[in-house]
Amino acid sequence: MELNWKKTWMVLGLILVLGFGMRVYHLGNNAFVADEFLDMNSAYGYFKTGEWKAWDFNSGQSSQVNINEARDERANIYKWQVAELFRVLPPTEATARSVSVFWGVVSMLVVFWSTLVFTKRKEVALIATFLFAVSVAGIIFDRRLRMYAMFFPAYLAFATTV
């Protein structure tokens, strides 16, 4: 039985809702870990000052001694998105990580498209998308404040088109 496009879009929509729900569920319950602190400091510093400087939350100002200066300019496109989100939402763990959740949903769409390009089968593309949507590694990847959640769909889309 071959799926028509209407059913395909409906199933894909359900998979996207499921994947989004699994990524956003209790998103702000855990404190930042490892490099998430550095990205939050940099994004918040840009939000407050318009410059790529780490923010010192203890003193409430940009860091005077910026030992991570070179790192503050990494992944500016990603951290700019986080900083822009702070204009409309409070600067919390959930708000900052929601940029990665967004890119996780984009990743699901790119997985569907890429699989469809290579296999020409909607069923296989839906299965691949579902497996990525419920994958523990994919969920963890898309719940961290890290630029890699944005890079994954970009690289997969590029690799598919080349």
Regions inferred by a protein language model and the residue ranges of each:
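Membrane-integral, polyisoprenol-dependent glycosyltransferases
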Residues: 2-162
